[in-house]
Design a protein with these regions (language model features):
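Substrate-binding/active-site clefts of carbohydrate-active enzymes
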Residues: 23, 45-54, 63-233, 497
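The feature marks proteins involved in alpha-glucan
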Residues: 1-61, 66-73, 80, 489-496
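C-terminal beta-strand-rich structural cap/linker in extracellular carbohydrate-active enzymes
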Residues: 494-527
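Surface-exposed loop/turn motifs at beta-strand-loop junctions within extracellular Ig-like
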Residues: 4-8, 103, 527
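Conserved alpha/beta catalytic core and glycan-binding cleft of carbohydrate-active enzymes
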Residues: 210-212, 226-386, 412-467, 471-482, ...
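Catalytic cores of secreted or luminal carbohydrate-active enzymes
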Residues: 396-417
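Conserved, mostly hydrophobic/aromatic
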Residues: 2, 62, 89, 99, ...
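Active-site His/acidic residue clusters
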Residues: 113-116, 382-391
Length: 527
């Protein structure tokens, strides 16, 4: 540690802000660590990685300490968990792992979002080399790794960056600017020294640990003072974000992903800095998440009055490159898990959750799910407990898990569902206005095929329901959320619907489809 005699005469022991490693909490001293590692074998992966605009991106967000516990061990180890984790991720057709923050932090309950060591990998889960091993193994298996990075605020603990020499070095000098809503200190992003510190830290994780991207936390608190639009734009912080993204893109030749967690409607977040934007590649679509879950919490009797909660996302979707997410924030603090947010009985919750995920995986935009979503987790996430893996011994959860993996397989193998996500030509509503029936239908358009997606968020079965389509030919059912192998009640062969030349929904052809209660249907037509 550094022993610093401050201007007031107070003597304080501080960690090294640039340390590569630290003691395990509650101890706080910095540790000298050799970062050289001669076992990297991911050269081919690094050469071929890119931002993935025309690729499938299906992210598994996880808290490494609570995914799967080791017996009699307080913490899992990066190296020990690597092969098991990577095998699981591949089996479920995820393309990337997103690790919640791994910068050192003192308080377990902050999940890593209240950092103390911006160059120090948390010692909870092993050594620097253990983390390198995990990333290297993921790359060898064709899995990308993204890390959460927190460039807006830091812990106020005495041993850390706060009032490092007795003055406001890293934070704003005025308390009303420095104090964040989380009880942490806001970085003074107007200072060149602070900007350099954070840009160096961002580069460090990509250079040293080969991360494929950074998900930037709390960007709304950089755009606006305290994240509050009424307080105005924080121009200094905004300029920092633009410069950091510009330099990261320049340094890594546009090959790493920069993802913004931003809850505001501030424009041009994913526009290039050359064109006046912030320079991110993707932005979490928190509006879509909120609107969709709000709709599905409601009794179906009242959903027709909130129909636009589902349709509104496509009104603004092409303004940014959005990433559709159900993250850790949606399954904590009394909000209930995804399946438990669904209205209805046990069986109805599962049925609606299956239809919800069909909607998610066929909606334009890249995908992210927090660990446990794929299990239909009932219990809210708790960082002290592992996932409830025992749920897979229950038929409903096991079937849902298989269904979730099938959606991932379908999404990652079908270019129509990902290649032109951000082109308006890839999506067309069939009927966005059937509020009385709680029905939604749209087309995902591709070069080789089209997909027709039908979503029924009502408890009514609609037999021989008519939908307009663009192409003639045979429409074959690829997936039905009510097939019994996925936990539904339907034991029937796939529907084959022949399009006839009758105009419907302003389309030249029409098909008749049986749509199950609380169910979704996915049909394919070849071109």
């Amino acid at each position: 540690k550094y022993r610093i005699t401050q201007a007031t005469g107070r003597v304080v022991d501080k960690m090294d802000p640039y340390a590569f490693y630290s003691e395990l909490r509650p101890n706080t001293a910095s540790v000298v660590e050799d970062l050289s590692w001669d076992r990297w074998s991911d050269e081919e992966w690094l050469a071929n990685r890119n931002k993935g605009f025309d690729r499938p991106i299906n992210i598994y967000e996880m808290h490494i300490g609570s995914w799967m516990k080791e017996e009699e061990e307080e913490f899992v180890n990066y190296r020990k968990i690597a092969k098991k984790l990577i095998r699981y991720v591949k089996q479920n057709h995820f393309t990337h792992i997103e690790l919640m923050p791994l910068c050192e932090y003192p308080f377990d309950g902050s999940w890593g979002y209240q950092c103390s060591g911006y160059f120090s990998v948390t010692s909870r889960y092993g050594s620097c080399h253990d983390l390198m091993y995990l990333v290297n193994e993921a790359h060898k298996a064709g899995i990308g790794v993204i890390m959460d990075f927190v460039p807006v605020h830091f812990v106020k603990d005495d041993f850390s960056l706060s009032y490092f020499d007795g003055t406001a070095l890293y934070e704003y000098p005025q308390a009303h600017d420095a104090d964040s809503q989380w009880g942490t200190a806001n970085f003074d992003l107007w200072k060149e020294e602070v900007r350099s510190f954070l840009m160096s830290a961002a580069s460090f994780w990509i250079d040293v640990y080969h991360f494929d991207g950074l998900r930037m936390d709390a960007i709304s608190n950089a755009i606006f003072w305290h994240g509050n639009k009424q307080l105005g734009v924080n121009e200094g912080a905004l300029n920092f974000i633009k410069r950091m993204n510009f330099l990261l893109n320049e340094r890594y030749q546009g090959k790493i992903m920069l993802i913004a967690e931003d809850s505001t409607d501030f424009p041009n977040v994913t526009k290039s800095t050359f064109d006046g934007g912030l320079g991110f590649d993707y932005k979490w679509d928190l509006g879509w998440m909120n609107d969709t879950l709000k709709y599905l919490k409601k009794d179906p009797v009242y959903r027709k009055w909130h129909h636009n909660n589902i349709t509104f996302s496509m009104a603004y979707f092409y303004s940014e490159r959005f990433l559709m997410e159900f993250s850790h924030d949606e399954v904590v603090h009394g909000k209930a898990t995804i399946i438990n947010k669904m209205w209805g009985t046990y069986e109805q919750k599962f049925a609606q959750a299956r239809t919800l995920y069909l909607y998610m995986f066929t909606h334009p935009g890249k995908k992210l799910n927090f660990m446990g979503n794929e299990l239909a987790h009932w219990r809210e996430w708790d960082e002290t407990k592992e996932n409830d893996w025992f749920l897979l011994s229950y038929p409903a959860h096991d079937a849902f898990h298989q269904y979730f993996a099938k959606l991932g397989e379908l999404y990652t193998s079908e270019p129509t569902l990902y290649a032109n996500d951000y082109s308006w030509e890839s999506f067309e509503w069939i009927d966005a206005d059937n509020a009385d029936k709680n029905l939604f239908s749209f087309i995902r358009k591709g070069e080789q095929n089209d997909y027709v997606v039908i979503l029924n968020f009502s408890p009514n079965h609609y037999a021989h329901e008519v939908f307009g389509v663009l192409q003639k030919g045979m429409y074959t059912e690829i997936l039905n959320t009510e097939w019994n192998r996925y936990g539904g009640t339907l034991d029937a062969p796939a529907q084959k619907c022949h399009a006839i030349r009758v105009s419907r929904n302003n389309k030249p052809f029409m098909i008749e489809v049986d749509v199950p209660a609380f169910g979704g249907v996915l049909l394919e037509v070849k071109k």
